[in-house]
Amino acid sequence: MLPEITGAHPRLFVDSKTGFLPLEDARKTVCGKALAERVVHDAEVLLKEAPAERIMQGRRLLGVSRNVLYRINTLAVAYHLTRERSFAERAAREMCVVSDFSDWNPSHFLDVAEMTLALAVGYDWLYDTLDDEQRLRIRTAIIEKGIKPSFAGRHWWITGKNNWNQVCHAGMVAGALAVAETEPELAEKTILRAIRNLPRSMKASFSPNGAYPEGPTYWGYGTEFTVVLLALLEGAFGQDFGLSEIPGFSVTGDFVIASTAPTGELFNYADCGKRLGSSFAMHWLIRRFNRPDWFSKNERNALKRETKLRPRTLKNSRNRLLPLSLLYLQDWAETASRKLVFYSGDTAEVPVAAYRTGWKSTDAYLGVKGGSPSGPHGHMDGGSFVYEANGVRWVSDLGAENYHRIESLGLTLWDARQESDRWRIFRIGPDSHSILRIDGEPQLVKGNAGIVDFQPDRCVLDLTSLYRGRAKKVTRRLELRPDQTLKITDSLSGMKPNARIRWQFCTAAEASGEKTLLLCSGGKKLAVKKNRGGKWKITPAEKLMHEFDSPNPGILIVSFDAAVPADGDLELTVEFLPENRKDR
């Protein structure tokens, strides 16, 4: 049984006694004042925008739901900052329009979850400004188009282990709390379901050391909605029922810091972008766990970029949860992190490691990826890595492909079987990743690369299961040295004589040379040396791509081939040697 929910509003994120005082407190800080000004500006722009329409993109309504969520969060926060009635009226108009949609697309339940969260916040935060007819209309939609469809049929996300679990339960709990006095039994059932099932995804997502299996971009998605759910529970009940104590969650900010390389680009494995925007989740986490060091230079600059923007139109969604950061923002003192290494832990769903030689923009960085291609948002990238030195990313990962574009062409993007179309997609399959290939074959999707030895300057991955049937043992050792050089040693045994091993990496730098490779970028140079094998081969990405692939301008796949000797064993050593390296 849950503690009783009172009939008083607001109760989402805040309580009826304290109300919106946290908004005023944040407004007294430098960063809070800047964000408040941006929110009010956007609210004024939204007064001129037409309400959302139910326009599908392929099988999704998600873009519309996200746009509505940004609009309602912005207008509701702006109303409580200014008491300007027009903001509340515009939010009510938006909510009434989407309440009249035929449905919120329950076949893709993320769409329902984000729409339900939007209306729940608006209904709760603007309750006193709505008339009885508006309240009934919005409340009915939350119940009939939001919460009840989550109990119709069997939804895999209820017990799932990825971001769908986090997002969908958060949306449903928001809706349940908003209408709790009208539907107390439905509300309690919905909230208890979330409390019971969220640990499944939290353990998979954060345990043991906070690394997110789907990469930093999806950390932003899954963690933001995990935080939404925990903040909702704390606002309504004064507790999160132990969810924030799940191992790894309290240190997950370390993962974000470690995943941001010296250039500001991410260690963008899996379906990931190049950079993170300012994060509502991070602001909550900093305050919840007293970690001002997570308000890093990158987060600080991202927030500044967001607050300086003054968009003239808001037809498409922006950083939709950022207005809620005003509940948690403080002027945290700038505290530099001094951790040069990060390890996900050997029990992590997707093992990763990150190393750096320092905290300057020119210091070296190495990100190492284990795991399985069949993992959440997985790529064929077991053993892959990214590498930076002297302010240049020399070895790249191309990150995510455009989902809608691929789906619209009829490709089976979400099928992780060995023969799936997914592995034909350049950014996702083996051709674009910095991995080993045996006889040109892809990695095995049922394989799983583990980090079997982690040290402060190096790690070893066991890649054997990715190449089962072609080798008895495959390991990769990566060492980032204090002088910024990177040494990679691949040991393969139990192979057929004369089998062809391809050693490849992805780069955006210019490349030349056959025996010793020279990479050049922005006036910087780096040599790549190997212990054996044939000449370096430099292949423009477009020669490896299909017509359905997104453009990858300037990207090269650099490789060499080596034949397996008669004894079936082979060791390959490759060194990346930046010019002007430290301690030369």
Regions found by a protein language model. Name each.
Residues 1-13, 20:
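N-terminal pre-domain segments of enzymes
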Residues 179, 218-394, 453-462, 560-569:
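Carbohydrate-active enzyme catalytic cores, enriched for enzymes
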Residues 11-18, 25-28, 32-265, 272-273, ...:
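Aromatic-lined, polymer-binding surfaces characteristic
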Residues 337-426, 518-530, 573-584:
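Beta-strand-rich N-terminal accessory domains
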Residues 172, 256, 355, 490, ...:
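A residue-level signal for conserved active-site and pocket-lining positions in enzyme catalytic cores
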Residues 304-308, 405-584:
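CBM-like, beta-strand-rich accessory domains located in the C-terminal region of large
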